[in-house]
UniProtKB/Swiss-Prot annotation:
GO molecular function: arginine-tRNA ligase activity; ATP binding; glycine-tRNA ligase activity
Source organism, top-level taxon: Bacteria
Pfam family, one: tRNA_synt_2f
Protein name: Glycine--tRNA ligase beta subunit
Cellular component, GO, one term: cytosol
Main location (coarse class): cytoplasm
Assembly: Tetramer of two alpha and two beta subunits.
Species annotation: Streptococcus pneumoniae serotype 19F (strain G54)
NCBIfam families in UniProt: glyS (TIGR00211)
Length: 678
């Protein structure tokens, strides 16, 4: 017979961003707890609101499965003394298992007998295991925790209630400073305390108290209500997924409504209005059928439709205050002079160990000069790049960005266009922040892409130079994200810029403000990001490509993909083994690898030398790999008919030189001796 288990923890208001991860974590840890305790179940459903985390297990076994375990002990010769009595070693072994020497049997393994005991454990009733759910709750981890009421323990928020029910059976358990009961709390304003009758009545018992415990149901309620408003007013409402997830974790009983604001605020840039609504007020944006922003918004109330008009007025009043700020800054910022703001950046600290933002911009500008040539920018693009690099951080000192920091770069674009700068300069100022996340949008323009790379490279090199290098998961200055951005942009634009050569060029630059240091660490850091971009590529293939001599990001990613693509083909293993053997022997070559045809002693030497001399890797990675694999028969014939490590030193070095020249060319693709063919 199966049972149903409910565990609910009632807390003070949780931060919206921790609700969903905590709910998921609770479900995963409950499943692990049940598995560890040999309790089978049909399904686990999790619940969450801003004031509760809960999990319900249905189809739960009414008892643990029985356990039979065999334990291997010492060898028989150690377990028995000369008189055939059990030694202390044998006695200690069985005692540790809760058994006696009478339980010992001997089993033969590979010609030798060993002590074995079998331990049988009868499964306990589920009621005996349920109290362990308290440990599951204690094991939950959170990004932040707090103390309260002078207690020594800490948790994400103060705990108010604990409910643990096995069907209708209530468990009186203690958790932190709370004693368990079947009492749960309803909606803070509309509901009251209520008793959960059974594990299966949980949602309905709370629904009567204006709490929708299932987040999926709350989400659907919000979406349906928004769609209803759309249909009623003939508008389009942007249901942003992240905003929706945040809003549903701010309410226990959602009611969506539409408010409005004065159309005069539409003269302010749309980005300012959208930021005010979405980021600051958690409102959904409303547009007409053509996508034009309307002077309306959608908000979601934590409650029902009672006195909704008052709620709408309150939300409108709060939003207008934000929009007034935006309108004021938009008007006042246009009076500022860009060159004056750039000069003031001399007094803004980039980092206390690195210097000012202006110094950061100057270094970035010098990097853009190198990159412009390597990226093949036109004369006009180079001019636009130079101008953008000279001013691109100015908007950090505007009133708008000071109030709405999410708009940095965006407002820079707006203000530069108003000041008469070219669209390319303006776009680059916006795009230099991209990407803002691991999978974020990339720059579209070449000028913006180069400025983004240059800005990120100086950031990375500057922090590394003063010893602020990420370690473990600690990366307070987001240098991994910056490096990932550099790698992604280079790959997206297909620029054949060798990162090792570029970094060498950067370290050769001279600045008054800073000297770049720790080049080796920077190179390893960049390679680690390329490694990450290779995703699920097998580790040995990643290592082979990363160990190669070609550090053009696009080429490396293409090479890894090509190797994975052919790794299941018949000729992959023998071809890689041939090249790998060449790589291993080539390491023994001394000095400059020059080949003297006069020292050839067989046709196979000559054939390989000629094949290497004419080898020019070209085309896509798949084609280059075919070129290399085509050498496999020639390499094999060479090894079958040639003693590479000949006694004659000149002959030996000549043969190693052939292999050295081969591997030098092949290494532009990958170091094949890093690939595992076993």
């Amino acid at each position: 017979m199966t049972k149903n288990l409910l565990v609910e923890l009632g807390l003070e208001e949780l931060p919206a961003y921790v609700v969903t991860p905590s709910e998921k974590q609770l479900g995963e840890k409950m499943a692990a707890f049940l598995k560890e305790n040999r309790l089978s179940f049909e399904a686990i459903q999790t619940f969450s609101t801003p004031r509760r985390l809960a999990v319900r297990v249905t189809g739960l076994s009414d008892k643990q499965s029985d356990l039979t375990e065999d334990f291997k002990g010492p060898a028989k010769k150690i377990a028995l003394d000369s008189d055939g009595n059990f030694t202390k070693a044998a006695q200690g072994f069985v005692r540790g298992k809760g058994l006696t020497v009478e339980d010992i049997e001997f089993r033969e393994i590979k010609g030798e007998e060993y002590v074995y005991v079998t331990k049988e454990e009868v499964g306990q009733a589920v009621e005996a295991i349920v109290p362990g759910v308290v440990d599951v709750l204690k094991s939950l981890t959170f990004p932040v925790s707090m103390h309260w009421a002078g207690n020594s323990f800490e948790y994400i928020r103060p705990v108010h209630t604990l409910t643990v029910l096995l069907d209708e059976q209530e468990f009186d358990l203690d958790f932190l400073d709370i004693k368990g009961s079947r009492v749960s709390r309803g909606h803070r304003f509309l509901g009251k305390e209520t008793k959960i009758q059974s594990a299966l009545s949980y949602e309905e018992d709370l629904r009567k108290q204006f709490v929708i415990a299932d987040p999926c149901e709350r989400e659907q309620m919000i979406v349906d209500q928004i769609k209803e408003i759309e249909a009623k007013h003939g508008v389009r409402i942007e249901i942003d997924a992240d905003l929706l997830n945040e809003v549903l974790n701010l309410v226990e009983y959602p009611t969506a409504f539409m408010g409005s604001f004065d159309a005069k605020y539409l003269e302010v840039p749309e980005e300012v209005l959208v930021t005010s609504m979405k980021e600051h007020q958690r409102y959904f944006v409303v547009r007409d059928q053509d996508g034009k922003l309307l002077p309306n918004f959608i908000s979601v109330r934590n409650g029902n439709a009672e006195r909704l008009k008052n709620v709408i007025k309150g939300n409108e009043k709060v939003l207008v205050a934000r929009l007034e700020d935006g309108e004021f800054f938009w008007r006042e910022d246009q009076k500022l002079v860009i060159s004056d703001l750039v000069e003031k950046l001399n007094n803004v600290t980039f980092h206390e160990k690195i210097g000012s933002l202006r110094e950061h911009m100057i270094r970035t500008g010098q990097i853009t000069v190198l990159l412009a040539e390597k990226a093949g920018l036109s004369v006009d693009e180079t001019v636009d790049l130079a101008r953008a690099a000279a001013i691109y951080k100015f908007d950090l000192l505007t009133g708008m960005v000071g109030e709405f920091d999410e708009l940095q770069g965006i407002m820079g674009e707006k203000y530069t266009l108003l000041a008469g700068e070219t669209p390319a300069v303006a776009a680059a100022i916006r795009e230099h922040y991209m990407p803002t996340s691991a999978e974020g949008e990339l720059p579209e323009s070449k000028v913006g892409a180069v400025l983004a790379i240059a800005d990120k490279l100086d950031t990375i090199l500057s922090f590394f130079s003063v010893g602020l290098i990420p370690s473990g998961s600690n990366d307070p200055y987001a240098l991994r994200r910056a490096t990932q951005g550099v790698v992604r942009i280079l790959d997206a634009f297909g620029w054949h810029i060798a990162m090792d050569e570029l970094i060498d060029s950067l370290y050769a630059l001279k600045f008054d403000s800073l000297t770049y240091e720790n080049k080796a660490e920077v190179m390893d850091f960049i390679k680690a990001r390329v490694d990450k971009m290779m995703g699920s590529t097998p580790k040995d293939i990643k290592e082979a490509v990363l160990a190669g001599s070609n550090f053009v990001v696009a080429d490396m990613l293409e090479a890894a993909s090509a190797l994975v693509e052919v790794s299941k083909e018949e000729d992959f293993k023998p071809s890689v083994e041939s090249l790998s053997r060449a790589f291993n022997l080539a390491e023994k070559a001394e000095g400059v690898a020059t080949v003297d045809s006069a020292l050839f002693e067989n046709d196979q030497e000559k054939a390989l030398a000629e094949a290497v001399e004419t080898l020019v890797l070209s085309g896509p990675a798949s084609q280059q790999l075919k070129q290399l694999f085509a050498l496999s028969p020639v390499i094999d014939a060479f090894f079958e008919n040639t003693m590479v490590m000949a006694e004659d030193q000149a002959v030996r070095q000549n043969r190693l030189a052939i292999l050295s020249q081969l591997t030098k060319k092949a290494a532009k693709f990958a170091c094949f001796n890093q690939i595992n063919t076993k």
